[in-house]
Amino acid sequence: MGQKVNPIGLRIGIIRDWESRWYAEKDYADLLHEDLKIREYISKRLQDAAVSRVEIERAANRVNVTIHTAKPGMVIGKGGSEVEALRKALAQLTGKRVHINIVEIKKPDLDARLVAENIARQLENRVSFRRAQKQAIQRAMRAGAKGIKTMVSGRLGGADIARSEHYSEGTVPLHTLRADIDYGTAEADTTYGKIGVKVWIYRGEVLPTKKKAEEGGK
């Protein structure tokens, strides 16, 4: 089961938290669509800013958006001009007050989404899929990953028949729930069609907090 399911979804509530944190009854569907619109808008507007994920919290008529990015300077802009323009655009999109937080990703080579997007961009620039994957694996292992697995699927190298090829180094224990495994996907638009990229990065075990460990011992 651990081999097939999304590793982040499997670990939610155990070692991962939800990316949308709010509660609603009647308005649930509307707010969910609003979240999707916010994420879609941010990913389009900041597609060159290495945005990994967007967290959304809600309270009354206010939306708190946290953007995790490897290039905070590009998101903030000169004197905060970019982030202010983004805040106004999101406020117009949602009709609510929007507050934006920006969190810098210190090690982008350990972020699966950013690694997948990097491989996808290289494939679009006609870099060999083997070379792109192997370079990404080397960078991740140098950055301190315990293990990494990458997979590309599609008409690789312009072949007539689509296939999948994957490379891995180290260990990636998908069944171990306390294993901190980051998972990310991306798509490369090549002249031969789309190529899908998947990346799994094992960053080490997350041990339970001392309080939980004490409760378990009672």
Curated annotation (Swiss-Prot):
Keyword Ribonucleoprotein: yes
Recorded family membership: Belongs to the universal ribosomal protein uS3 family.
Organism of derivation: Geobacillus kaustophilus (strain HTA426)
Keyword vocabulary terms for this entry: Ribonucleoprotein, Ribosomal protein, RNA-binding, rRNA-binding
Protein name: Small ribosomal subunit protein uS3
Oligomeric and partner information: Part of the 30S ribosomal subunit. Forms a tight complex with proteins S10 and S14.
SUPFAM superfamilies found in the cross-reference section: Prokaryotic type KH domain (KH-domain type II), Ribosomal protein S3 C-terminal domain
Single GO BP term: translation
Pfam family membership, one: Ribosomal_S3_C
GO molecular function: mRNA binding; rRNA binding; structural constituent of ribosome
